[in-house]
Structure formats: C-alpha cells, structure tokens
Amino acid sequence: MHVDHVVYAVGPAGLAAEAKRFEEALGVKSRDGGIHPRFGTIMRLIPLADDRYLEIVEVLDHPAADKAPYGQAVRARSELGGGWLGWVVAVDDLTPFEARLDRPAVAGLRHFPDGRALEWRQIGVKGLIADPQLPYFITWLSEPGVRPSALKGTVALKNIEIAGKRQRVEDWLGESVPPVFDSVGIDFSSPNGYPGVQSVTFVTDTGEVRI
C-alpha cells in the first residue's frame, strides 16, 4: 500500500484563494488539475516528493456532484467551512476491497487543460463519509507518464494527524498501521472525538509546515 495523496476541500474563499494559501505556506506553485466530470468537482494539485501529491478540491454546481459520493463528500466538508477531507491509499488491485465492501469500484476521470485524460478506479468514499478517519482506495489505470506521480515535487509529506482509533483504520485497511506507514507518520489522537484528518505536516525547503 502506498500513501498516495491527501485531499483538502476548500472553504468559502474558493479554489484559487485556497490554492494560493497553500502555495505561500509550502513555497511551491500549484497546478491546474482540471475537472472530475463524473464527480462534479474541480481541483488544483501540488506535487510532492515520493510519488505523492496534495489535492485541493472544490465542488461544482453540477448534478454529478449530487449523485457521486465523492462530490457529496467534498460538498459536505466545504459547507462546514472547508478543511482536510481525507487521505488516499493506492493499491495494485481493488478486488479484495470490492469483495469486502460488496460493491464495485467506480471509474474516475480527470481531463487535463491540454485535453489529455487521467483514468483510475476508486472505492471507499462512502466509508470516508460515514467515518472520516478512513482513507479510500485508488488504482491508477493510465500510463505512469500522465499520473500525478510523474510531477516530481520537492515538498515531502511527513505526518498525518488523525482523530480516531488506529485499530479502526487497521481493520479497514486489512493490515497494521505502524507509527510510520509507507514512510509517512500516522498519529492518532482524540479517540472519542469527531473522527477525521486534523492536520498534515509537510517538509519544505525552509522547514516543517503544519496545516
């Protein structure tokens, strides 16, 4: 399993303003990630080191956002003022998770500004909606050259602080989650509080930044 990316749902300021805030905090530029037409969302991304990235996402006023769980999740987080939506784990095969959750993975599609398409499959967003400490799962279908990991970043993802219980996440993943998981620190706090990602720490050229 690979900690693939973290997702931030924008607040009232909107996508451009939130992306600029991250750019200033991390000292790097974000990129136009295009639209998720099947989910009713639009995003910008910041490439990170170690084949990871930061997704900054905004829901669109589009029927797809009302139907797709991902669009619903982004809208709900944004309506609460915005903040960390969750974390995402990449796997080679979604079949075991489809069997365990008793539903098929859904197809994802994102169009680049230059017209190219990025395709993947994902599952587990409904689990994230019900219990925001849980990551969802993704398998990339497109060639490596168009995946976000092809955009090599200099900022590193160091740590994710999660309100929740380690055992709950381990049961969801089907494997243990040590304090350092795939080279990323996974800290759990507030086991009896509202679950979800509380903060993310990055390592930049000028030091650590906790958001």
Feature annotation, model-predicted:
Residues M1-D4:
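Extreme N-terminal starter segment of soluble prokaryotic enzymes
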Residues Y8-G27, R100-R116:
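Compositionally biased, low-hydrophobicity segments enriched in charged and small polar residues
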Residues A9-A13, V91-D92, I160-Q167:
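Short, surface-exposed ligand-recognition loops at beta-strand->loop->(often short) alpha-helix junctions
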Residues V10, L15-V74:
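Glycine/small-residue-rich interface belts in oligomeric ring/scaffold proteins
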Residues A16-K29, F97-R100, K165-V177:
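Amphipathic alpha-helical segments
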Residues G34, R44-P47, Y53-E58, G86, ...:
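Vicinal oxygen chelate
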Residues E58-F97:
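A basic- and aromatic-enriched beta-loop-alpha substructure that forms the phosphate/nucleotide-
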